[in-house]
């Protein structure tokens, strides 16, 4: 079954949900009033919304931590009821020091959860590092074909499995039969797809880093990435997600996204097709650098992808110079 397959990938007991958000919500819903929780400064916007709503209602207090500030996360594990990590983080692609953070001794009631969507089970194993819960939006890389909604929680403890199973029933968050079938189909080719996509990502990140119209590239596989050494210590691969910042004003980044022909200008990610978008235009993402483009690298020919990126960057540069 789907849950047996997904549990095997993450080395735990898995529960499938109707979406990634449905899976994440179950974890936050278990917190009693007065809880303390820690989340990244810039988490997935749906998680940010859940946390902000509970904060407004007075349900919990929140620490928003820099993903790279390992000392603050270590302190949070000792003091909070829920520690929610997202690694690599969306959209800055920052990798948390999971071996250190997840290995901190903690109270039995404290839960350390990791959104591992960008890494997939093939690139990191949070449960083996000491996490209690791993969450994936299976809509993304596990499904891999941009044609389903699904989520998964994999846990290391039987009591959490039973609790989340009950909450899934109470909240009507069970996955549909067709979505379960499609997720199984996608998971069977995850290894092949990820191998190609992350090889493409490494090549494109390297080339973008040297492009005259790009001011910064964020990809854990690059030695220039702030958390490259952290990622290299425990990840099996660096994934297929990267982000880069164009030169010029923020609007120029939007134009680059609109100019591509092979790469889709879209918000979803993790499919066989490449997608990208300017994240600062998304509500709640105003703190993101204005020219940052999040790029989900697919399985197309890498030379075709590079030609598309290069022409979009050059075309918008020519217009900018002409306007000046």
Can you say where each PLM-predicted feature lies in the sequence?
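Conserved PLP-enzyme active-site core in the AAT-like
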Residues: 14-213
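Aromatic- and Gly/Pro-rich amphipathic surface segment
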Residues: 1-10, 18
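A common structural junction motif
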Residues: 171-172, 259-270, 312-321
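Conserved C-terminal alpha-helix-loop-beta "cap" of PLP-dependent enzymes
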Residues: 216-293, 297
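Short amphipathic alpha-helices in soluble, non-transmembrane regions
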Residues: 164, 254-261, 308-313
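PLP-dependent enzyme catalytic core of the Aspartate aminotransferase-like
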Residues: 52-53, 58-63, 74, 98, ...
């Amino acid at each position: 079954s789907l849950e047996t397959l997904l549990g095997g990938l993450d080395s735990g007991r898995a529960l499938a949900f109707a979406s990634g958000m449905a899976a994440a919500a179950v974890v936050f819903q278990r917190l009693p009033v007065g809880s303390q929780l820690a989340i990244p400064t810039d988490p997935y916007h749906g998680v940010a919304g859940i946390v902000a709503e509970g904060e407004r209602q007075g349900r919990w207090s929140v620490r928003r931590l820099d993903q790279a500030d390992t000392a603050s996360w270590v302190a949070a594990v000792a003091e909070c009821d829920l520690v929610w990590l997202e690694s690599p983080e969306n959209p800055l692609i920052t990798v948390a020091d999971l071996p250190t953070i997840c290995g901190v001794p903690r109270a039995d009631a404290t839960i350390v959860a990791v959104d591992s969507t960008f890494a997939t089970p093939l690139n990191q194993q949070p449960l083996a590092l000491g996490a209690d819960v791993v969450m994936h939006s299976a809509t993304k890389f596990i499904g891999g074909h941009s044609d389903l909604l699904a989520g998964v929680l994999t846990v290391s403890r039987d009591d959490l499995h039973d609790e989340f199973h009950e909450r899934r029933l109470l909240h009507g968050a069970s996955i549909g039969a067709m979505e379960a079938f499609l997720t199984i189909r996608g998971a069977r080719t995850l290894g092949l797809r990820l191998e190609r996509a992350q090889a493409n990502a490494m090549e494109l990140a390297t080339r973008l880093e040297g492009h005259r119209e790009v001011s910064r590239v964020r990809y854990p596989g690059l030695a220039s990435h702030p958390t490259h050494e952290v990622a290299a210590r425990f990840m099996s691969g660096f994934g297929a997600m990267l982000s880069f910042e164009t030169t010029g004003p923020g609007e120029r980044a939007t134009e680059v996204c609109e100019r591509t022909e092979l790469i889709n200008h879209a918000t979803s990610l993790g499919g066989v097709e490449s997608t990208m978008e300017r994240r600062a235009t998304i509500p709640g993402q105003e703190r993101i650098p204005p020219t940052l483009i999040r790029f989900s690298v697919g399985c197309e020919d890498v030379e075709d992808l590079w030609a598309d990126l290069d022409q979009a960057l050059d075309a918008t540069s020519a217009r900018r110079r002409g306007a000046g």
